């Protein structure tokens, strides 16, 4: 039996995550208090059906150690994955404003504005976020995008191997919050300054050929490969579910896309479970 624990900021998409898990055959329980989690799992441990539980700010224990200890205990006997969903403050505020719903902290008596509630919740959840196997930033994701991302990540975990996620991004759009490692490639030769290459992306052959002829590009790619290859066994022993590697250039169109694609394809050839995403390209 697999157990998925879904947590995160209110308005970040926990209900969407549960619907996806339900579609994938999971038995889903919404807003289960942490102190009942072990008892609940024990009651259904002989079931062949996978289980997903969402944890809400309203029923989290005041002491983060309780969640940490509960998860550590469950992981000794079950296949447990913790998913944490988050989004930028302004996006969460926008979502609540559009739906005109009350924030959970307002419902339990906190005397604060919506903006203060969002900030307070993130502060409370910071310790819980550290327990997550997978952190997803839903700021720019539609319900469909989030559903597809979750479906891909969850199905990618079926073999119980560590999933390597390579994602390109543009620094001008902000740092990805779900990355374990971030590599800055803005110092590499920029195809943007070649008029014929400017409208293309790092997935196009002319751009790939342009970058591949520069020694520093190949050297950096090989050094990142070597770094990850060296430390991958230790990361796998640490019971991680995902390793997210983000590669950033200025706009997220050329250099980061090329390096990300090359790294992803390299580790696929090594037999690893790999997912490749290009965040800036997904915006258009």
Curated annotation (Swiss-Prot):
Key words of the record: ATP-binding, GTP-binding, Nucleotide-binding
Record-annotated membrane-spanning stretches: none
Keyword presence, Nucleus: no
Residues reported in the UniProt entry to bind ATP: 8-15
Keyword Membrane attributed: no
InterPro entries associated with the record: P-loop_NTPase, RapZ-like, RapZ-like_N, RapZ_C
Molecular-function GO terms, alphabetical: ATP binding; GTP binding
Amino-acid positions noted as binding GTP in the UniProt annotation, renumbered to this chain: 56-59
Any one Pfam family match given in the protein's UniProt record, by short name: RapZ-like_N
Family, as annotated: Belongs to the RapZ-like family.
Function, as annotated: Displays ATPase and GTPase activities.
Record protein name field: Nucleotide-binding protein VF_0384
